[in-house]
């Protein structure tokens, strides 16, 4: 196995060497790929084969990402009027794919993530015996520089708490409370939107919330912050009512606008590529901070505001 790994190492660009690459080489050594007559050689058809092959390991969120990449590939294939075969995924393909995506105004980060998925499909195809191009392992798109992630400071949160009640509809008040809860609990929207008073227990005089994270399956015990307890007291011990992710994102932008969280902030947001055509892409720029607020800001705000003050284990 040492000779096999070293031989493979000497034949690829060292920038592609990572844990995934090593695991693939080990798999190849112990389970040499054989020709699989059932596996399609066309890339788009192979995506469906890949989904079926890994159906017991793939989460709904991952499946959603795969379908998005598949739709992008379908549009790309239609634009070039030529079927994409796995064996043709090489440097020329990569450049053509990048140029197409840029023309369609996709952000570089989106292009890079889509290409990582394309390589994943092709490497899996290689594993089951489908012919791939010798350039495959060396193909990469450089990740864009990370932009500073926005979060709500304690000053921002105080502004949100102090919004005049007569400015808020019931829906906005509900979203405002969820936003505060998320910023003081640090949980994902898929988890905090499922919070209920039945999940609360008391231990040594402290109120603790127990739940299972939807994404990870981990059992969590979270002490309830005084700001969360204030909201529960206001609502007779109940959490705000559940709303959809989309409505929550829309409402908290409005809440932060009412709180005058307007400082110019670098970031990206979805904008229509051309008025009236209904196609949206993420566009980077400088915007008012409230325009960049999304559901993940609660988790990010908690992590930033409480870093070093609350134990992480």
Q: Could you tell me what each predicted segment is?
A:
Residues 167-169, 238-239, 253-312:
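Short, basic (Lys/Arg/His-rich) helix/loop patches that form interaction surfaces
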Residues 102, 182-183, 307-308:
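Short amphipathic helical patch at the helix-1/turn junction of helix-turn-helix
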Residues 108, 112-114, 131-189, 215, ...:
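Basic, Lys/Arg- and aromatic-enriched nucleic-acid-binding interface segment
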Residues 123-133, 182-205:
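Short, charged phosphate-coordinating catalytic segments
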Residues 48-61, 70-148, 163-168:
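N-terminal core-binding DNA-recognition domain of tyrosine recombinases/integrases
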